[in-house]
């Protein structure tokens, strides 16, 4: 009981920073008043539904605070009150995550009940000194002969799969999750259709793969903020298990949809479109995500694998940027 007290104190609010909504245009919300920093979580009072809508501070413009919500903007009105929690997005961490499916806000969606968490990790990409990352020396066994025999992968290595739709990427992910010689798998499904999520869990992953996996899901019908946060939350959870001394395999499907969500956010807050409509922030955020998790100096190795859905024959600027992030390996498929 007493060990929970420091966490409760840290999450308590002693000062309230309150503003009000000025403009709502599409996904972008502008508020005035109060104090805020980039990344702060705010709660917007929804009078229509008598509830609070969570949002995040993503920018500032003309003296106003720009917000993006984690939920629908339905019911948010001009003049609605906004309260800054002075907190960042945090996810509950612990062994209770094994075999569970959560959304990009860290909330369970599998119907198995809420978490009783006493520890939280902040979702944030922190720069790591490259000299603290030892070279890759140890082989990781995937339990798949075609990979272990012809495409040997080391612990801490990053692998990208560049392929079009319908070639069996999800099937391969399920095979890897069931057979890989790691302690736990963390899988991020970004922008998937709802039907595909259930099919992946039941058909591709199966009971054997699910019991030692954690799924972080943000479907295509959810706001761009959740889709953008999905791989970051998965990375944070993977870092937790790595810190506990476990070997972890992190898989993401897909980086393209992560970049598309980042593009939606960038365009909504006024970033200029550049190559193929992508905004400059994408080319700053992609390297942070790709380089976020590797082998630590004192931690167990973390095998890192990303999935990028683009045909190799039509590789454009985004694909080239991702390829540069996968300097250690890439798989291609038609």
Question: Where is each model-derived feature located?
Answer:
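A near-ubiquitous, low-amplitude feature marking generic local secondary-structure context
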Residues: 4, 12, 84, 133-136, ...
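Acidic-enriched and Gly/Ser
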Residues: 1-142
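P-loop NTPase catalytic core
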Residues: 149-150, 156-334
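P-loop NTPase nucleotide-binding/switch module
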Residues: 80-82, 89, 96, 109-158, ...
